[in-house]
Amino acid sequence: MSLLPYTSELGVSKAKHLLRRSCFHYNKTLLYQISSLNVDQALDLLFSDNTISYAQPYDPLPTESPHGYWLESTEYPPDMPNQGRKRGLLSQWWFYNMVNRNNIKDKLLFFLHTTFTISSGDIGASHYFYDHLRLLQYFSSGNLKELAKKITLDNAMLNYLDNTQNNANNPNENYAREFLELFTITKGEQIGEGDYSTYTEHDVIMAAKVFSGFKTKLDRSIIDPDTGIPIGRISVNQHDQSTKTFSHAFDNYQLSGGTDENTIMSELHEFVDMIFDKQATARAYVSKLYRFFVKSEWTADDEANIINPLAQQLIDNNYEIVPIVRTLLSSQHFFDFGDDDPNDEIVGSIIKSPLQLAASMIRTFEFIIPEPSEDLGNYYRFSMYFLRNNYFPMSGMELFAPETVAGHPAIYQSPDFDRHWFSSSTILARYRLTESLITGRNK
């Protein structure tokens, strides 16, 4: 088993496997189209569908009403009611667009959500969530290192992990800790008190100093020049301007503190570059990609022949995500080609998440979600009342709203991983989904 490419025509069986892993859904037309292609041609096709059914979510209330005052406004009125409902509209807007196209970038966007996790109910105003989704969409075929820089000034993230409260004289380490432990290099084997081999508690303290003074911008009037998306602000007088010295895990690297907005941004970029220069960071991302697209566990041989070479490729490509995903999804290993071990199956080894189950069932039954512009009432009844308020909570996967910053247990928690999707409390939602799509009764 290796990263050598699978070069034959896919055929129906391997086309199904590729589509199940790379997309949230497919139909018979796409399946038979893909089955006659080789994997490179198939991936070209699956990266090319950029259909956007609706550029913005529909809100039934007029924009001049406070209830509809939420997406493009640069003001922040003191009373913005129904923010939970508006965040629900946003998650269902993304779902509607995803179901109406076949694009690997939708799967990659959700991968980025599982990597740089927020919970939409804990980020403040709904338009912050809108900007956050657009940021993930922007980087769904982009650069992981650049996303790590940009997301630090994302208003939703600043609120979610309290970094907007992080000041030089009153440090808050929440974001710094999760940035190292979950978002980038991840925690390695503990080799001493406060020493996790990949970073130390001292590095968390230093990282919090780097992140100090980054604040939410309530009116969203600062626009990132690269993404065109609103970002937070830098409070120079609340930033720790001292020199930061990191531990042996980062070769005792010294980082000069910024003293104005430009040098503070340079300090942030240098800090992120320091982390991404480490092989452990590349291995962490590749391990997550492998678990997301291939299977939840792997052998020592997989580590040596798949994970480590892909990690080096990720570094060589300066953390561009698409080349790594293409290498993995086109490999003989991904298709279980030439593997005689019956206990090491890749095809059929991942239990569908409630999100993928819903999307795939909608396409399988050729269920047409009502169009918001033509049938707004039925669209809301299905998208909000059934999916958002009923199916997803009952299934154990509230969309873009995991219970903790670590994400859904099925994504990361050993030894069960994706088996977490099946429990006595969540299995009924799967049965009811099928029944509802067949009968048209939303339960």
Language model feature labels by segment:
Residues K14, Y26-F139, I222, G228-I229:
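N-terminal accessory alpha/beta regions
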Residues S65, T198, D203-S266:
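Long, well-ordered, tryptophan-enriched scaffold segments
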Residues N155-I223:
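Activity-critical C-terminal alpha-helical subdomain
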